[in-house]
Amino acid sequence: MDDRDLIVMANDKVEFQQDTVALVYDFDGTLSPQAMQHYGVLPALDQTPEEFWGRVKEKRKDEGAEELLVYMKEMIDLADAKGEKLDRESFRKHGSTIEYFEGVEHWFDRIDEFAKGLAGDASISIEHYVISSGLKEMIEGCSIAKHFKSIFACEFRYDHYGHPYWPARVISDTSKTQYLFRVNKGVLDVNDSINSHMPARERAIPFDNMIYF
């Protein structure tokens, strides 16, 4: 994003014609009451949340490292030490055990139907997105994944055996704004740059049409 993007955000005189509303969700603590790693992954590694996060915070402090990088690498190291297989398939399997706040599983169909009734004859549509510091593969394996147009979350790099060996993508609280701009501009492929200026009227979903949970 550049200064022109910020100007677009501040310009309240731009008339948008887009009729899509984006509902953008964090995951842990928003859709699910616990960090997603607590479901499946940590039990498989014989770790309590207190043990795991305590060690992560200690290593973060000792090594002066980013906490998200530390927690992802710590999972790999623990799995290797225990001989526990971690790959895309196992992460998705663990994701299928994620529990939600009451009502979440039915929320998406209900709000979609509500929007249709609210719109009347207008052609308003709703799109759902996740921007999370959790693991993309786990979210892809959860029961509500089918409702999301795009899932932006942390990812691993995998070797030719399918074994994760280093973080490939980390989404911190600060960097989440980049992904809001991706939704805004309709540039959902994370390999595509969003730095080029795009006129407001060409943007897929204006910020006024976004609700962030």
Predicted stretch roles:
Residues S175-F213:
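Conserved Lys-Pro-Asp/Glu-containing loop-to-beta segment of HAD-superfamily phosphomonoesterases
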Residues E63-Y71, A168-K176, N191-H197:
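Noncatalytic linker/hinge segments flanking ATPase motor cores
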Residues K149-K185:
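Histidine/lysine/aspartate-rich catalytic loop segments that bind and position anionic ligands
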Residues M1-P164:
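Alpha-helical substrate-recognition element adjacent to the catalytic core
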